[in-house]
Amino acid sequence: MTKHYDAVIIGAGHNGLVCAFYLAQAGLKVRIVERRDIVGGAAVTEEFHPGFRNSVASYTVSLLQPQVIRDMKLEAEGYRVIERPISNFLPQEDGGYLKLGGGLE
């Protein structure tokens, strides 16, 4: 049996998921395909070395428009943005370091 879709979204990153949500809300039959075994794209936290986890680009989730968060009722699903006082730490060869983030002087 052949299945028919109005739209096929390639990639289950945060943009693809938001796109699929709005298309489905508009009444379209949507299919999402993702090559990886995890959804979220750049917004996921993954173990890159045993015992070490990082969210390389998870900041992208904080760029979601407030209207998208409301439309998708993400807060009811546990979505929340946690502000970090330090967003980046870069150690230097001479023992010094560079810290970047909101509120740092």
Pin down the residues of each PLM region:
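N-terminal glycine-rich phosphate/pyrophosphate-binding loop and immediately adjacent elements
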Residues: K3-E105
